[in-house]
């Protein structure tokens, strides 16, 4: 017998003790502050949680790369320890779920919309899987004392985190209370929100940690067990197919039930594995030689070696080649599975569904008879293994049981964006949790861009105290804005609404003198007003001097009272002696006292409303460049004000490509895009002209640096450009090719998942959208 296996069984050999209570079923003997559990005389375990990656929707090449990287991870496992890979399906606790996603009432006129939105969210939650899939890796090792165990786990943990990082998966060590929560949530389904554990408090009171996690009662029958009012059954993989698809684990864990699947891995040192393989090959060759000798003694000199002997020899040679030339390791594996249900009938039906799924892959699950308690302790991430149904595998054949499927996005206190097409779970994202919360919504006309933007605007206004500012060149948002109590500001040469281009708050300068920053803005404005030509050094000096002069009184009054206007600025220019000043004054006359003087008057609209929509549909060609600059500067004013109040600002710019047609507004927008994050603001660009957008290097950089992108149905040329820029696989591309409105891909940080967002039509909110 292989030495590794002999030593392992010797280490794990324990005297059987009949459990006197439910606590005795739990095989943990001691717990430590750093998440290490003692699970035997000299055995310690530690659990690491790793995140899912987009394996199911990756291209063939990417899948191969992930598979090889996962094989590398398995190869790196220490042969002196046992590794348990666990997939845990747990149902979301309805109370926690509702607290996370439902919008609280505020006692204002918008409560009717909040109630309606909450009703929609609850319907979506009921129709969704409502299952969260957690993935763990538990390492258990024999050490003389806890200090040795700590040193070992510190070394192994760093390697694990690095390997998972190369896969694109985030791996973290679990603390003591996090590990105990796994067992509590399994044993006490429905009581998830009641878990509270403080190790110091527990020690002080002399309580056992097991009291916090164990169920009220446990009964073990021949082929199932009862845990409180729930039923459970442990299965094991009895027979493996010669060829197994990499989707098997995903299909087995796709059942919409509380369940766990564990793969126990015992790596064998390569020298020992090679020696064992050589001995086995020698044994097969000896059998063949003996068979031929017997045939020769019977004068049967032309007899061919039997097929089964030839096969054995061929397979052993391949196995030896794998170990010696293909960088494979020999592994022992045990696959166990536990699932629970509310009734025995449901349990039997679920068992049959699992057995059918395994048979589809030509594998066979077996029910553990009279071993349910051992099976349960094996499948759960304690770090123990009581089931000995080992199967010898190579790294490659073990890697087929790859635990990855698709990323789910569920941020606490996030916004609903749709449902994951693959896992059927709700996509709840919070842009505030991203490194860069700026966003783009891209898609062909009729793909659902405005609908997606309006959905987010509704959610922000109803669920938070954040401000929302919209730039609307198509007059699409007016109805929604008015219904939500917002202010629509019509900007044109003939409009009665005016925004003062020289509006400035104390916070405008980001801690420095705000006039310095405003002076730069007025220089850009003058360049536009003069006709897009660059200003000379003299002209810039004059503008800077006049800007400081017109703001002096306003600054001395601590930014209170009447703000100067462009008319005051022109009057100041006319006071200057230099001929250049007179030239600038003449050039901007049309925009200060002429027919296009809409931005040279005092602001007469409510720019302090929580929800503001700048309607720029009637802004003519002459006013468009300066109009966009003034609107963007007004937005910057508002953002800096909100920053001082600790309030977030969401900016939505529809048909954003229009801003990139003018150099100054494009550069101003680029600066805004870089700066808003530190101001607690989040900008969203909406466009159907992706190809045009990507012609601008500025826009391309902005898109590449945005961590939140909603891609709906795309035109063929746009798809290719996006695929190159965002590294989208062909399979992922199919989710933005000829799909219905509201379907596509959503990029949240490094996650890229296919989604569908269907909104009920018989609602007030839908009519507003």
Labelled PLM ranges:
Residues 485-489, 698-711:
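A short helix-turn-beta junction within AAA+ P-loop NTPase domains corresponding to the substrate/partner-engaging
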Residues 459-469:
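Post-Walker A helix-loop "phosphate-sensing" segment adjacent to the P-loop in P-loop NTPases
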Residues 726-769:
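Conserved P-loop NTPase
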Residues 1-404:
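Extended, folded cores of ATP/NTP-driven motor/assembly subunits in large transport
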Residues 53, 60-79, 90, 253, ...:
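P-loop NTPase motor domains
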Residues 449:
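Conserved lysine of the Walker
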Residues 441:
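Hydrophobic anchor at the beta1->P-loop junction of P-loop NTPases
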Residues 452:
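Hydrophobic positions on the alpha1 helix immediately C-terminal to the Walker A/P-loop
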């Amino acid at each position: 017998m292989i030495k590794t296996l002999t030593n392992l069984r010797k280490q794990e050999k324990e005297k059987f003790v009949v459990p006197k209570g439910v606590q005795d079923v739990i095989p943990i003997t001691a717990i430590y502050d750093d998440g290490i559990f003692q699970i035997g005389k000299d055995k310690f375990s530690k659990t690491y949680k790793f995140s899912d990656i987009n394996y199911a929707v990756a291209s063939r090449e990417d899948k191969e790369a992930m598979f090889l990287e996962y094989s590398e991870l398995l190869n790196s496992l220490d042969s002196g320890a046992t590794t348990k890979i666990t997939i845990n399906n747990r149902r979301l606790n309805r109370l926690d779920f509702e607290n996370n996603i439902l919008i609280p009432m505020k006692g204002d006129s918008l409560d009717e919309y909040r109630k309606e939105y909450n009703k929609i969210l609850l319907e979506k939650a009921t129709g969704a899987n409502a299952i969260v899939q957690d993935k763990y890796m538990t390492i258990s090792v024999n050490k003389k004392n806890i200090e040795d165990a700590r040193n070992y786990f510190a070394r192994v943990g760093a390697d694990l985190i690095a390997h998972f990082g190369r896969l694109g998966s985030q791996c973290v060590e679990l603390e003591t209370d996090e590990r105990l929560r796994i067992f509590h949530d399994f044993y006490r389904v429905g009581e998830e929100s009641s878990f509270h554990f403080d190790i110091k408090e527990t020690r002080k009171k002399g309580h056992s940690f097991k009291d916090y996690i164990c169920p009220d009662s446990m009964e073990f029958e021949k082929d199932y067990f009862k845990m409180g009012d729930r039923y459970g059954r442990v299965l094991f993989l009895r027979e493996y197919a010669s060829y197994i698809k990499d989707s098997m684990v995903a299909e087995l864990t796709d059942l919409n039930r509380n369940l766990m699947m564990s793969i126990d891995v015992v790596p064998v040192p390569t020298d020992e594995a090679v020696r064992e393989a050589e001995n086995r090959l020698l044994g097969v060759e000896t059998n063949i030689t003996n068979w031929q000798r017997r045939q020769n003694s019977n004068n049967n000199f032309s007899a061919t070696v039997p097929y089964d002997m030839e096969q054995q020899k061929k397979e052993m040679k391949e196995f030896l080649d794998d170990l010696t030339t293909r960088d494979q390791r020999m592994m022992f594996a045990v696959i166990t599975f536990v699932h629970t249900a509310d009734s025995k009938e449901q349990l039997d039906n679920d068992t049959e569904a699992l057995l059918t799924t395994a048979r589809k892959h030509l594998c066979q699950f077996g029910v553990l008879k009279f071993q349910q308690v051992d099976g349960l302790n094996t499948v759960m991430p304690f770090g123990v293994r009581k089931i000995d149904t080992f199967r010898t595998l190579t790294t490659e054949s073990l890697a087929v049981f790859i635990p990855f499927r698709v990323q789910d996005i569920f941020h606490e206190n996030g916004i609903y964006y749709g449902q994951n097409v693959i896992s059927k779970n709700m996509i709840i994202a919070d842009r505030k949790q991203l490194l860069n919360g700026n966003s783009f919504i891209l898609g062909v006309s009729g793909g659902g861009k405005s609908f997606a933007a309006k959905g987010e605007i509704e959610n922000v206004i109803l669920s938070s105290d954040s401000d929302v500012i919209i730039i609307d060149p198509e007059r699409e948002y007016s109805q929604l804005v008015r219904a939500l109590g917002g202010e629509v500001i019509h900007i044109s040469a003939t409009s009665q609404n005016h925004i003062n281009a020289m509006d400035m708050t104390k916070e405008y300068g980001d801690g420095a003198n705000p006039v310095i920053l405003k002076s730069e803005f007025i220089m850009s404005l003058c360049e536009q007003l003069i006709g897009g030509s660059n200003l000379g050094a003299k002209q810039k000096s004059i503008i800077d001097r006049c800007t400081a002069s017109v703001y002096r009184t306003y600054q001395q009054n601590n930014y209170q009272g009447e703000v100067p206007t462009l008319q005051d600025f022109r009057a100041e220019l006319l006071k200057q002696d230099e001929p250049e000043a007179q030239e600038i004054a003449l050039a901007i006359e049309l925009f200060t006292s002429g027919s296009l003087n809409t931005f040279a008057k005092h602001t007469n609209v409510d720019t302090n409303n929580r929800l503001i929509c700048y309607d720029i549909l009637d802004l003519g060609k002459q006013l468009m460049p300066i109009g966009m600059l003034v609107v963007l500067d007004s937005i910057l004013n508002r953002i800096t004000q909100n920053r001082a109040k600790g309030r977030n600002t969401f900016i939505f710019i529809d048909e954003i490509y229009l801003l990139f047609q003018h150099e100054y507004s494009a550069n101003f927008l680029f600066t805004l895009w870089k700066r808003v994050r530190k101001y607690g603001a989040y900008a969203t660009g909406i466009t159907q002209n992706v190809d045009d957008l990507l012609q601008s290097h500025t826009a391309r950089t902005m898109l590449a640096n945005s961590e939140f992108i909603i891609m709906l149905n795309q035109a063929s040329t746009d798809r290719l450009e996006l695929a190159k820029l965002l590294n989208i696989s062909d399979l992922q591309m199919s989710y933005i090719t000829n799909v219905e409105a509201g379907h596509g891909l959503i990029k949240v940080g490094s996650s890229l998942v296919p989604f569908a967002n269907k909104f009920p039509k018989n609602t007030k909110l839908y009519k507003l959208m």
